[in-house]
Curated annotation (Swiss-Prot):
UniProt xrefs under Gene3D superfamilies: 3.30.70.1730
Induction statement: In response to low temperature and salt stress.
Name of the featured protein: Large ribosomal subunit protein uL10
Highest taxon, organism lineage: Bacteria
Pfam families linked to this entry: Ribosomal_L10
UniProt keyword Mitochondrion, yes or no: no
Record-linked PANTHER family: 39S RIBOSOMAL PROTEIN L10, MITOCHONDRIAL
Keywords of this entry: Ribonucleoprotein, Ribosomal protein, RNA-binding, rRNA-binding, Stress response
Species assigned in the record: Bacillus subtilis (strain 168)
Described function: Forms part of the ribosomal stalk, playing a central role in the interaction of the ribosome with GTP-bound translation factors (such as IF-2, EF-Tu, EF-G and RF3).
Length: 166
């Protein structure tokens, strides 16, 4: 009996630490997915460096209380799987949202984004954002535009002066 309780405590600690450490956590209902679909989902999440696990709701509830994310308890009914990402905030939301579009059986329930409990709508809005690299490239192109325009204007003036001088 004691070893079972100790094992459960370890699992609760594991879930709580993942909830605290992850930048983004998404809770999904995977009922209705067959084995090959779940395997494909796990593969896509693994490629995005996202951990995907199924835990008992009672242990998850205790971990949620430890992590002080009590707003999640309302979503912990039925079979749930949890996707954790410690690197990218957008990755789990994007992969799960894209997968849910193709497989109606997968339902996004809620999430934790940078320590804040988020609704399904917020998770889906996050999924529509470009990745960090995409946002950085957009920012870089916006920052380069004035310099590029100045260089083109200077080149045009130089060519015009050259034509007038010739």
């Amino acid at each position: 009996m004691s070893s079972a309780i100790e094992t459960k405590k370890v699992v609760v600690e594991e879930i709580a630490s993942k909830l605290k450490e992850s930048k983004s956590t998404i809770i999904v209902d995977y009922r209705g997915l067959n084995v090959s679909e779940v395997t494909e989902l796990r593969k896509q999440l693994r490629e995005a460096n996202v951990e995907f696990k199924v835990y008992k709701n009672t242990m998850t509830r205790r971990a949620v209380e430890q992590a002080e994310l009590n707003g999640l308890n309302d979503f912990l009914t039925g079979p749930n799987a949890i996707a954790f990402s410690t690197e990218d905030v957008v990755a789990p939301a994007k992969v799960l949202n894209d997968f849910a579009k193709n497989h109606e059986a997968l339902e996004i329930k809620a999430g934790v984004i940078e320590g804040k409990v988020s609704t399904v709508e917020e998770v889906k809005a996050l999924a529509e954002l470009p990745s960090r690299e995409g946002l950085l490239s957009m920012l870089l192109s916006v920052l380069q535009a004035p310099v590029r325009n100045l260089a083109l204007a200077a080149k045009a003036v130089a060519e015009q002066k050259e034509e007038q001088g010739a």
